[in-house]
């Protein structure tokens, strides 16, 4: 799934301009860890495919059948996206038409990210917002605990369950 953020920059004439940034993350539903992501100034196939490739590489040694789930956005219906999954023996799952609940884990992550990082703050450049999102994802994965994960962070939960 892709989500949009806005930031505000002064143009060459000193006028305030609203700009946008797009985040394309991939989440492991086992522990809710963001395993890859890409950030771009425009919604693009390149951004989605970059995050997809990172997710493919990160899960390459998985001992279970990999399934990549997404909403029905244009980027996840691209032939290249689907081909990349097929070549790596990854099953594709897509939300049912008109059913946002099928993608609720990612939508929940977006809500948490925006509530804890974005709302109430003003960002004045692409780089400032990009760095804040990157730092937040690191925090979310390694420090932010979840009741659902026995009060562990996603990374700590993964490490605890794989060590057992």
Describe these PLM feature segments.
Residues 1-164:
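Charged DNA-binding/catalytic regions of mobile-element recombinases
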């Amino acid at each position: 799934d892709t989500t949009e953020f806005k930031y505000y920059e002064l143009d060459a004439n000193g006028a305030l301009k609203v700009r946008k940034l797009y985040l394309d993350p991939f989440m492991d539903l086992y522990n809710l860890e963001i395993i890859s992501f890409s950030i771009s100034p425009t919604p693009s196939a390149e951004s989605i495919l970059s995050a997809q490739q990172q997710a493919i590489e990160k899960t390459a040694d998985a001992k279970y059948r990999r399934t990549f789930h997404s909403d029905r956005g244009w980027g996840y219906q691209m032939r290249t996206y689907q081909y990349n999954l097929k070549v790596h023996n990854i099953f594709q799952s897509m939300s049912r038409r008109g059913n946002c609940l099928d993608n609720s884990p990612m939508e929940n992550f977006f809500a948490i990210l925006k509530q804890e990082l974005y709302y109430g703050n003003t960002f004045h450049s692409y780089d400032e917002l990009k760095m804040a999102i990157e730092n937040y994802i690191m925090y979310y994965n390694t420090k932010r605990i979840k009741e659902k994960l026995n009060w562990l962070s996603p990374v700590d939960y993964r490490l605890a369950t794989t060590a057992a």
